Amino acid sequence: MEFFMSARKESRKNNRVKLGSPLRVVMGSIGADVRYDMVSRNISHTGFFLDFEKPGRFPFTSASIMEIWLELEEGSTIFFNGKMARVVYPNDEAARETGPGIAVRIVQIDSKNEKTLFEFIDRKIRELQDNRNNVA
C-alpha cells in the first residue's frame, strides 16, 4: 500500500467545510485495541477539528500518531494516520470561531483514501455554493 502526502495538497487551496451533520470519527493509538468514538463537523483536505468540551482530557498527546477512521457518509469510511495539531480551550480567542476542541492533521494517507476525501470535500463545497446561489 502506497502512502504519501501528495503535491496536490500543497498546490490546492486548503478548503475547509463546516458541515450541518456531524461525521463519525473513530480514533486509536497505532496497534492499540482501545478506540474512541468522536464527531467532527469541520474538515479540510489536510485534517479536521473535533468538538471537544474539555480538550485537556483528550486521550492523546501532541507526540501521538493516531489511526483514524472518518465516516464521510454511510458506506464510505476512509482511513489515515493523524497527529494533534493544536488545542483550542474554551477561554481561547479561537474558541469564539470554532468552539473548544482539537485540530487533527493528516500525516499519512494512501492515494485511494485521499482521492475519496478530496472528492467528498469538493462535492460538499459545490453543494454549499449551490445552496447559497439558490437563496440569493
Positions of PLM-derived features:
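N-terminal helix initiation/capping motif
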Residues: 1-56, 118-136
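Short conserved beta-strand and strand-loop elements enriched in small hydrophobics
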Residues: 22-28, 61-78
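Short beta-strand-centered aromatic/proline hotspots
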Residues: 37-38, 80-87
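Short, solvent-exposed secondary-structure boundary/capping segments
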Residues: 49-52, 88-106
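Short, conserved charged micro-motifs
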Residues: 57-60, 112-115
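Well-ordered alpha/beta subsegment
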Residues: 107-108, 114, 118
